[in-house]
Amino acid sequence: MKALIRKAVIKDSISILNLIKELALFEKEPASVILTTSDIEKYGFGTHPMFQCLVAEVENKIIGMALFYERFSTWKGPTFHLEDLIVSKSYKGKGIGTQLYTAFIENSY
């Protein structure tokens, strides 16, 4: 299945949070998510973003994401850390994760 992989925009914040909650449910930790849509908007799309995010979209629905941020390696210099790569349960096994990971690599140092 081919998805549209694109950089997330502020209006995607609700979908991003829903995917995070879906992951937490899978990990049997649903109560651990204290992040809000406002937090995602502030820290991902505010004046000084702390993370970047790619989303996978199929038929105008966000069904996956790769959330990452810059860091510094004392051995390698600037790099990115992939915090989470999430694909909605009903779309797993369809190549969406591979498409997101490939796009992440292409957008990294």
What are these regions (language model features)?
Residues L4-N18:
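A short beta-loop-alpha structural element at the N-terminal edge
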Residues V87, G93-E106:
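Conserved acetyl-CoA-binding loop-helix of GNAT-fold acetyltransferases
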Residues G44-V55:
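A short helix-loop-beta-strand connector motif used in the catalytic cores of GNAT acetyltransferases and
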Residues V55, K61-Y69:
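Conserved beta-strand in the GNAT
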Residues F68-T79:
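Conserved donor-binding loop and adjoining core beta-sheet/short helix segment
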Residues P78-K89:
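Conserved acetyl-CoA binding element of GNAT-fold acetyltransferases
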